[in-house]
């Protein structure tokens, strides 16, 4: 698969993104600079083949209904990847985001020490905001792993898609992916309290209902983390 070589290239170059669109070569983004990988112009049928190889039958059906698909997966010895498949001007486009395989420690990210204190709180709402590519996902993963390493309890995440995979350490970590482990955001957030979490991650607050749920979790004695664009 052409993506196998691209994944390897992303890891070697520490690239953040790959862009695959019809009518132009595949582009790679390295340290904020976007450039073509080669001179081969991608055709719609070439991209469609790549997209459908990435999706399961269930994901294919959902994509054909909504024309949008988010998915993630890990490649051994390379890392984790988040993929967005969408339509533009009548053809399929793909954007791949490279996510480091190992969750970095908070101290390695040169972040304010207060983040380590916040993630150990018993209750409250912590919002991580920033532009695309600013490190929101990595920051939250590092915070959650800090709690996982240092406090017993139950951490529940609701994500679309799952980006970092956590190991059970002092805490039990249950990760739910929209479309795979739960029908939709509404169902996952409605049932979260029945799963007795101490700490909840809402992968992204996208609407009023998700924000209301986050506030309700914090007000009922839980620590809730979420991202906002």
Range-by-range predicted roles:
Residues 120, 126, 141-196:
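P-loop NTPase switch/communication element
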Residues 19, 27, 146, 154, ...:
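Histidine-centered active-site/metal-ligand motif
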Residues 135:
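Conserved glycine(s) of the Walker
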Residues 1-129, 139:
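N-terminal "pre-motor" subdomain/linker immediately upstream of P-loop NTPase catalytic cores
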Residues 32-35, 161, 193-229:
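Conserved P-loop NTPase nucleotide-binding/switch module
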Residues 8, 116, 145, 190, ...:
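Alpha-helical segments flanking ligand/cofactor-binding loops in enzyme cores
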Residues 103-107, 182-187, 205-211:
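Switch II of P-loop NTPase G domains
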């Amino acid at each position: 698969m052409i993506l196998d070589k691209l994944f390897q290239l992303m890891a070697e170059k520490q690239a953040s993104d790959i862009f695959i669109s019809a009518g132009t070569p595949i582009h790679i983004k390295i340290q904020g600079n976007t450039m073509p990988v080669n001179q081969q112009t991608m055709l719609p049928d070439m991209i469609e083949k790549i997209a459908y190889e990435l999706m399961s039958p269930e994901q294919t059906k959902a994509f054909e209904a909504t024309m949008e698909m988010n998915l993630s997966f890990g490649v051994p010895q390379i890392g984790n990847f988040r993929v967005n498949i969408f339509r533009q001007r009548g053809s399929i486009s793909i954007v791949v985001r490279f996510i480091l395989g190992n969750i970095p420690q908070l101290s390695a990210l040169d972040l304010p020490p207060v983040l380590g204190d916040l993630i150990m709180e018993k209750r409250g709402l912590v919002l991580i905001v920033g532009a695309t590519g600013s490190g929101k996902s990595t920051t939250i993963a590092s915070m959650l792993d800090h709690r996982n390493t240092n406090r017993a309890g139950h951490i529940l995440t609701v994500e679309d898609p799952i980006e970092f995979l956590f190991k059970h350490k002092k805490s039990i970590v249950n990760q739910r992916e929209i479309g795979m482990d739960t029908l939709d955001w509404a169902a996952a957030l409605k049932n979260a309290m029945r799963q007795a979490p101490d700490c909840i991650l809402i992968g992204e607050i996208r609407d009023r209902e998700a924000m209301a749920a986050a506030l309700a979790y914090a007000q009922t004695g839980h620590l809730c983390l979420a991202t906002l664009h």
